[in-house]
């Protein structure tokens, strides 16, 4: 029987394991969209708060939602690039309108997703995640050099600070042990910021101006707007997140020695959809199950939900204290850029890892990957490629992630799902789901 002190300590460890990943999402998005200090403070604080709420939704089991596993929810990293692109092209309102609709979509398809999931084998999800990561790299390099439009863009100081942060992250990964490796990005951000503070100084104005307590405000950034290209993009991201969450659910069920049923998965997907909708209402981001916390459950051997309840409680309390959120907003742009290179590179690596499950003896699978990545990157590099087409077509070709996703899904159906006259080939293994 775990005492309250041990439960609190184990819960806080889960917070530390996911904190860097959770905080980096609002930092990168807010930085790319030019948010001021006050807006960034709110964005980080409400994000931490909503991570706690989203986690509670999964822990609490009732007829309608909650999978009841020791799962922690955090911001979906794969949503960073699409959100930045939507914000730059259509405005902040379109971001949150599309997030709300995508959450509603997840809620509605929850009972059917275990059947739909076969349309998203590794050849599709791996291609999509790879394209997402590749489209993020230019954002990272721009920030590493000082940020778009910076007067000292590309200066020796900015490049040294950015690459120095990246080097520190690499060294922690190389020589760190256990938990230190799990927070290598956080260590890099702290180390780079300390160097910048000692060398040039950092303004602590946002921290001193931030209040000690605040309450979350619905639609803080204004009324949401609903743009079809943005909505389609976020629905595709939600589907990819659901596939990834399914893997996390089954991993935790295996660790917990609990067999998942169709109803369990439906409640889990509903909780995720509700969390995404609330994220849109309170102006945060889509949520998904965090795999890094699965590793902690495995390493600690502690499978009780009490620990995750404690983690959710810590997240909610931290999110109500803006001064804590404000500390993360004073990180210099080149430091963020250095961390972005590692983070976004890891998104690419995750996509390649997912593609490792693909049957590469099939020429059809190679063609699916080639076309999906090629079309996705092509539209990213030349965004005006389809401007001459009707608006309906441009809904699916407005950005590289949507174009790459549609290409991968369509070609997978053609090559791997429609029966062929020739001998049956070995296709990808379908994502595991409950019978």
For the regions a protein language model found, what residue spans apply to each?
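Intrinsically disordered, low-complexity non-transmembrane regions of multi-pass membrane transporters
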Residues: 1-10, 204-219, 254-258, 268, ...
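Short juxtamembrane and helix-loop transition motifs at transmembrane-helix boundaries
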Residues: 2-9, 30-39, 55-65, 85-94, ...
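Membrane-embedded helical hairpins/re-entrant loop segments and their flanking transmembrane helices
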Residues: 4, 30-66, 233-305, 428
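Hydrophobic, membrane-embedded alpha-helices of multi-pass small-molecule transporters
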Residues: 5-18, 22, 154-166, 184, ...
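The first (N-terminal) embedded transmembrane alpha-helix
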Residues: 11-28, 72-79
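Membrane helical hairpin/interfacial module
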Residues: 38, 46-47, 56-115
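Short, non-helical or kinked segments that cap or interrupt transmembrane helices
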Residues: 42, 64-77, 118-127, 181-186, ...
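Membrane-embedded alpha-helical modules
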Residues: 86-203, 312, 317-425
């Amino acid at each position: 029987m775990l005492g309250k002190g041990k439960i609190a300590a184990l819960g806080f460890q889960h917070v530390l394991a996911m904190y860097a990943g959770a905080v980096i999402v609002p930092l990168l998005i807010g930085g790319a969209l030019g948010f001021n200090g006050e807006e960034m403070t709110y964005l980080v604080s409400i994000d931490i708060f909503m991570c706690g709420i989203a986690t509670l939704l999964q822990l609490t089991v009732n007829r309608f939602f909650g999978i009841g596993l020791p799962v922690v929810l955090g911001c979906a990293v794969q949503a960073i690039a699409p959100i930045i692109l939507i914000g730059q092209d259509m405005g902040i309102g379109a971001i949150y309108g599309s997030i709300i609709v995508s959450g509603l979509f997840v809620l509605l398809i929850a009972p059917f997703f275990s059947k739909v999931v076969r349309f998203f084998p590794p050849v599709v999800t791996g291609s999509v995640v790879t394209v997402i990561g590749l489209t993020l790299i230019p954002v990272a390099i721009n920030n590493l050099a000082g940020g778009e439009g910076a007067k000292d863009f590309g200066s020796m100081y900015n490049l040294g600070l950015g690459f120095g942060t990246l080097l520190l992250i690499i060294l922690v990964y190389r020589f760190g042990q256990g938990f230190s490796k799990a927070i290598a990005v956080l260590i890099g951000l702290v180390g780079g910021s300390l160097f910048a503070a000692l060398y040039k100084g950092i303004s602590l104005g946002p921290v001193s101006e931030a209040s000690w307590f605040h309450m979350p405000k619905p639609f803080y950034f204004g009324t949401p707007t609903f743009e079809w290209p943005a909505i389609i993009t976020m629905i595709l991201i939600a589907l990819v997140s659901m596939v990834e969450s399914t893997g996390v659910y089954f991993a935790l069920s295996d660790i917990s020695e609990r067999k998942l049923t169709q109803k369990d998965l439906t409640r889990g997907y509903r909780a995720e959809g509700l969390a995404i909708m609330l994220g849109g209402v309170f102006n945060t981001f889509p949520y998904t199950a965090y795999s890094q916390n699965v590793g902690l459950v495995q390493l600690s051997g502690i499978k009780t939900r009490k620990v995750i309840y404690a983690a959710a409680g810590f997240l909610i309390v931290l999110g109500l204290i803006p001064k804590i959120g404000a500390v993360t907003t004073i990180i210099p742009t080149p430091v963020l850029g250095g961390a972005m290179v590692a983070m976004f590179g890891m998104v690419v690596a995750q996509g390649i890892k997912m593609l490792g499950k693909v049957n590469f003896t099939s020429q059809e699978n190679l063609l699916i990957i080639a076309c999906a990545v090629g079309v996705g990157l092509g539209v990213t590099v030349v965004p005006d490629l389809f401007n001459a087409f009707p608006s309906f077509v441009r809904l699916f070709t407005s950005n590289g992630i949507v174009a790459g996703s549609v290409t991968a899904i369509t070609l997978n159906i053609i090559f791997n799902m429609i029966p062929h006259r020739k001998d049956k080939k070995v296709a990808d293994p379908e994502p595991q789901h409950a019978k």
